């Protein structure tokens, strides 16, 4: 008898787990899609210069990280909306995006990755980079971006920046 009860309990537990998996997967897919939509909306607002929409899509405690040559005024970490908008002003004074193309994007839960190609023109030197690859890792919570971790060919950008 004891063995039958264990088997019955195991079967019930397995059935419960099996039935719960699609619901969890669907929830994860819904969260992933919502995160991807938020990041794409933020990216679109940024590309269109829509600061109001950007601000609405940013968490108050958002962190923006750019790695690279510390001589470039837009390399570093900024925390909070005010600091990020200040950074974006500095960036736009120094850089014009000559080409932008998202090639791949995917999300897993609250994390989004975007990969693409871009080309920049540096306003101080007038130099242009060759087209290069970028990558973005972003995190979303409650419909707002909380992390924007940017990766690009910083060598090419630094070379163009330092051209006189």
Regions found by a protein language model. Give the residues of each.
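A short hydrophobic beta-strand element
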Residues: 109-118
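A generic structural micro-feature
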Residues: 78, 95-96, 108-110, 126-132
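Short, low-complexity N-terminal intrinsically disordered segments enriched in polar/charged residues
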Residues: 2-56, 61
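Hydrophobic pocket/interface hotspot
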Residues: 39-42, 54, 58, 62, ...
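A solvent-exposed, acidic/Ser-Thr-rich amphipathic alpha-helical stretch
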Residues: 60-104
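Exposed beta-sheet edge and beta->alpha loop/turn motif
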Residues: 117-141
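Short beta-strand edge/turn micro-motifs at domain boundaries
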Residues: 133-159
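Short beta-strand segments enriched in hydrophobic/aromatic residues
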Residues: 58, 118-120, 152
């Amino acid at each position: 008898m004891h063995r039958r009860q264990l088997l019955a309990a195991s079967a019930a537990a397995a059935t419960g787990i099996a039935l719960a998996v699609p619901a969890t997967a669907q929830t994860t897919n819904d969260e992933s899609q919502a995160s991807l939509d938020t990041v794409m909306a933020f990216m679109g607002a940024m590309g269109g210069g829509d600061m109001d929409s950007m601000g609405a899509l940013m968490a108050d405690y958002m962190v923006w990280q750019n790695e690279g040559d510390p001589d470039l005024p837009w390399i570093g970490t900024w925390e909070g909306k005010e600091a990020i908008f200040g950074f974006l002003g500095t960036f736009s004074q120094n850089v014009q995006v000559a080409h932008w193309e998202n090639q791949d994007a995917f999300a897993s839960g609250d994390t989004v990755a975007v990969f693409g190609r871009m080309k920049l023109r540096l306003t101080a030197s007038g130099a242009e980079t060759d087209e290069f690859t970028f990558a973005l890792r972003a995190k979303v919570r409650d419909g707002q971006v909380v992390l924007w971790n940017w990766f690009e060919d910083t060598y090419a950008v630094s070379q163009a920046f330092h051209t006189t």
